[in-house]
Structures are given as structure tokens and as C-alpha cells.
């Protein structure tokens, strides 16, 4: 789940990587000035999505997308398509 595209998507686009996907980070590294946090709620530091110049958690991103297509903090367009940078931990896929 999450590693494979549906049959329709494969037939439409082939095996090439889909464009316009924003990476979702499972674990952000700690920086010189502290940990990365969600700019909206300031609590979440895992599962962050990069908006134009800041990060948002999935909960805040969903809340902002329910109101508008634009970010309430920076005014940029909110990301709608996500892709995992690292594969979530799961048993290996065996057909």
C-alpha cells in the first residue's frame, strides 16, 4: 500500500515518476536553532510537508485546504499531491 500505483495510473502514465509531488518527511533532522515544527500549530515535528518557505503538519494542511487553496501563513498555493521521501516501515512486498 502506498508503494504501487493503481492499474489505471500505470496504463495512463507508464512507469515514469509523476510530476508535481511534494515530499512528506517522516523525521526531520535537528538544526542549529532547534527542531523543525509546523508553522501553524507549533506542536507537530513529524510528517511535515514543505509549503513555500515553512513546514505544515498533515492536520493543519487538511484544515487549510478545507478553507482555501492558498496558505493562510505565506499566501502561496498549498501542496495537494504528496510523496514519501523514505519508504514507511512495512514488511517487504512479495507477490
Curated annotation (Swiss-Prot):
Molecular function in Gene Ontology: RNA binding; zinc ion binding
Post-translation changes: Myristoylation is required for the role of RING finger protein Z in assembly and budding.
Ranges annotated as RING-type zinc finger: 38-74
Lineage top rank: taxon: Viruses
GO cellular component: host cell perinuclear region of cytoplasm; host cell plasma membrane; membrane; virion component
Primary subcellular site in the record, as a coarse category: virion
Residues lipid-modified (N-myristoyl glycine): 2
Keywords: Host cell membrane, Host cytoplasm, Host membrane, Host-virus interaction, Lipoprotein, Membrane, Metal-binding, Myristate, Viral budding, Viral budding via the host ESCRT complexes, Viral release from host cell, Virion, Zinc, Zinc-finger
Membrane topology: Lipid-anchor
A Pfam cross-reference name: zf-P11
Family assignment from sequence similarity: Belongs to the arenaviridae Z protein family.
HAMAP family given in the database record: ARENA_Z
Description of how the protein assembles with itself and partners: Interacts with protein NP; this interaction probably directs the encapsidated genome to budding sites. Interacts (via RING domain) with polymerase L; this interaction inhibits viral transcription and replication, Z partially blocks the product exit tunnel for the releasing nascent RNA product. Interacts with the glycoprotein complex; this interaction plays a role in virion budding. Interacts with host eIF4E; this interaction results in eIF4E reduced affinity for its substrate, the 5'-m7 G cap structure.
Protein name as annotated: RING finger protein Z
Species this chain originates from: Bear Canyon mammarenavirus (isolate Mouse/United States/AV A0070039/2000)
Gene responsible for this protein: Z
Amino acid at each position: 500500500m502506498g508503494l504501487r500505483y493503481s492499474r489505471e495510473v500505470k496504463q495512463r502514465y507508464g512507469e515514469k515518476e509523476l510530476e508535481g509531488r511534494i515530499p512528506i518527511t517522516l523525521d526531520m533532522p535537528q538544526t542549529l536553532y532547534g527542531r523543525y515544527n509546523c508553522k501553524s500549530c507549533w506542536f507537530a515535528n513529524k510528517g511535515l510537508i514543505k509549503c513555500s518557505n515553512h513546514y505544515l503538519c498533515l492536520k493543519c494542511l487538511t484544515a487549510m485546504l478545507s478553507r482555501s487553496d492558498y496558505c493562510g501563513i505565506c499566501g502561496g498555493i498549498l501542496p495537494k499531491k504528496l510523496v514519501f521521501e523514505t519508504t514507511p516501515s512495512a514488511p517487504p512486498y512479495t507477490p
